[in-house]
A protein has these predicted regions:
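Extended, low-hydrophobicity, polar/charged segments
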Residues: 1-164
Length: 164
């Protein structure tokens, strides 16, 4: 059995502290896109949780980082995310900001176990599946989770984020 990456261990431990069993599966070729991940796992692309981090700007130009969990079959509507966060606009942040705020690389951000607490917004389309798959700390590692457990364990708010 190959040794687990330290990020995966961190996700397993964070899950345990929340009462969530994390059983990671590794895909050495990686899962750079939601479709790649779905194909590797053998599930519908809508069952892949895309963890997206944005900076939302309030009227006084303070920028807060927030996270959106979006179904792999949907595109995020940035205006909807900004509105949900009570902000005027939002923008993507770079890889360094993602790693600094969560402790994980882009493509590997799990639903919990982040270095800093971020507000989380969840695409309701994820809740239509019996099981969804989220990153487990690296580009190559994912784990299955029931969508209601994803919502409660992450403390996220369910809000329409889908680009129409």
């Amino acid at each position: 059995v190959p040794e687990l990456h330290r990020n995966v261990v961190k996700v397993i431990e964070a899950g345990r502290s929340l009462g969530v069993v994390v059983e990671p599966r590794s895909y050495p070729q990686g899962a750079k896109t939601a479709q790649d991940a779905a194909d590797a796992i053998g599930v519908a692309v809508g069952q892949i949780v895309k963890s997206l981090i944005f900076g939302v700007a309030t009227s006084d130009d303070d920028v807060e980082l927030v996270m959106a969990y979006v179904s792999g079959s949907n595109l995020l509507d940035e205006k909807k995310l900004a509105a949900a966060a009570g902000a005027t606009k939002c923008q993507r942040v770079d890889a360094d900001a993602v790693r600094q705020s969560t402790g994980y690389p882009i493509g590997g951000v799990p639903p919990f176990g982040h270095d800093n607490e971020l507000r989380i917004f969840i695409d309701p389309d994820l809740l239509t599946h019996p099981e969804v798959w989220a990153a487990a700390g690296t580009w190559n590692d994912v784990f299955p989770i029931a969508p209601d457990v994803l919502a409660t364990s992450s403390g996220g708010s369910i809000v329409d984020l889908k680009r129409d």
